[in-house]
A protein has these predicted regions:
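Nucleotide donor/acceptor-binding cores
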Residues: 2-6, 264-267
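Active-site and donor-binding regions of nucleotide-sugar-utilizing enzymes
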Residues: 7-33, 37-251, 309, 360
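Conserved catalytic-core segment of nucleotide-activated headgroup transferases in glycan assembly
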Residues: 20, 26, 246-332, 406
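Short active-site oxyanion
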Residues: 35-36, 167, 211-216, 299-300, ...
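Short acidic-hydrophobic, aromatic-tinged amphipathic segments that line or gate anion-handling sites
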Residues: 57-60, 325-328, 333-334, 399-411
Length: 452
């Protein structure tokens, strides 16, 4: 049997969790239909097991053409009004993630941060100067620049050309110049392409496609809408397969989430990647529960984001009863393993609290009662409350019916208290448009397209 040849591009370590550790590549190989080469950059060279049925190829060069960089910046500048997130990102070039003069830190520290913010803004403006320039050009000039760049763009590593795949699959969380080059060159040489978007926020927060692939795989139906409205991609080319690493939630839907002993009561706080004074929220929540139920009677577990943005609020948790998750070595993928321990952290919580993050969506997928932290603070422009209004994908989560939330710490505590008093054990949220746990696995859906 002649096998279909797949070239899979993994240029960031988090994709190892999605495509290798999830078992997706193994499933494709076990189907017997595919010959697979995995292409990585030098940074990932030592992170993959070479003793597998797939071949790992380390790319000597992954740099992009100047035309691809121009197209990528131009597309972002032209499309910056298509998403609230793009607009907020554009503002943060000038104003950074922090309040300009956070007086709550005191005059001396506030002045220091004012100067730091100014330096950061200057660096941002320098690094984004081409985008800023394109954003003020008239359409006739941007069209001419785009036309000239399209005539010259296109580059793909010789290692991929020599393999001559039937399909090139690019796993990505941002549309960057490398993706633009690969898509341009594969069009010229007749290789079919799939861009596999690796999270639910990528289409609304990163950039705009300058060139489109044959197919785009996304997390859910709402992401299909974003692909159409923001990127202008034909609906027939956008496939809501889900995420490879989220197939575990399809298995749990099919087999049922194992019953957990929810005694003692437990509240899990899921940390935010953006700068937000969440430790103040965690402390206030823990203090309230200690007063109402007794010290430590209701467990409060704080799970910080594994890669949080720097915060200027140096507040540290003071309540000694708060259990803070300490991550093991994350050097391989940059993220925690989605293993039994990870799932149990969600399933064993009576209430999951947090900003509108991926982990909150995952808690909803396993039916945990959730409370959104959409409080604001006096230090950061990206606090949960502000981000929830300025990020398109977070607004998608805000729109979910019957999802409790707190705009102030008091409101948040009240919402948590209401769930604990009611003894609510599970909630079925209407989130099929964000992620459908009832469909076939990612591997099954991908195989059907690759062999069609």
């Amino acid at each position: 049997m002649v096998k279909t040849k797949l070239s899979i591009i993994l240029l960031s370590r988090e994709y190892i969790r999605s495509w290798i550790d999830s078992g997706l590549v193994k499933s494709l190989l076990e189907s017997g239909h595919f010959e697979i080469n995995i292409y990585v950059n030098q940074d990932l060279a030592g992170l993959l097991d070479r003793h597998q049925e797939y071949k790992v190829v380390v790319l000597d060069q992954t740099d992009s053409t100047q035309s691809a960089k121009i197209l990528n910046d131009l597309s972002w500048a032209i499309g910056r009004t298509r998403s609230l997130t793009f607009q907020f990102t554009f503002e943060r070039i000038f104003f950074t993630d922090n309040r300009i003069y956070p007086i709550e830190l005191g005059i001396r520290k506030s002045t220091v941060w004012l100067l730091r913010n100014l330096r950061t803004a200057i660096r941002n403006i320098k690094s984004k100067r081409r985008i800023l320039g394109y954003s003020i050009l008239p359409r006739c000039l941007t069209s001419r620049i785009k036309s000239n760049a399209l005539a010259q763009v296109g580059k793909i590593p010789i290692e991929i050309k020599e393999f001559n795949p039937d399909w090139l699959i690019i796993v990505c969380n941002t549309i960057n110049p490398t993706v633009v080059d690969y898509l341009a060159e594969t069009r010229k040489i007749g290789i079919k392409t799939i861009v596999a978007i690796d999270n639910w926020d990528n289409l609304t927060s990163k950039s705009v496609f300058a060139l489109t692939p044959n197919y785009l795989t996304v997390m859910g139906r709402q992401c299909v809408n974003h692909a159409i409205s923001i990127h202008g991609i034909d609906s027939n080319s956008v496939l809501p397969f889900g995420l490879p690493r989220f197939d575990i939630y399809r298995s749990l839907k099919k087999d049922g989430v194992p019953a957990k002993n929810l005694t003692p009561k437990r509240v899990l706080y899921a940390g935010f990647s953006l700068a937000h004074s969440e430790k103040r929220v965690v402390d206030a929540l823990a203090d309230y529960l200690d007063i109402k139920y007794g010290p430590g009677v209701v467990e409060v577990h704080y799970r910080p984001h594994p890669a949080p943005n720097p915060r200027i609020d140096d507040y540290e948790i003071k309540n000694s009863h708060v259990d803070v998750t300490e991550y093991r070595d994350l050097s391989r993928t940059g993220m925690p393993h989605m293993n039994e321990e990870f799932i149990n952290a969600l399933a064993e919580a009576n209430v999951v609290v947090g900003a509108p993050t991926t982990l909150m969506l995952e808690a909803m997928l396993v039916g945990r009662p959730c409370v959104l932290d959409i409080t604001s603070d006096k230090f950061h422009r990206t606090s949960a409350g502000n981000a929830a209004q300025r990020y398109t994908h977070m607004r998608d989560l805000l729109a979910v019916r019957d999802l409790a939330r707190g705009e102030t710490i008091d409101q948040l505590i009240s919402a948590v208290n209401k769930i604990l008093d009611a003894g609510t054990t599970t909630v079925s949220y209407e989130i099929e448009h964000l992620y459908d746990t009832g469909g076939p696995s990612y591997a099954e859906q991908l195989t059907s397209i690759l062999l069609a």
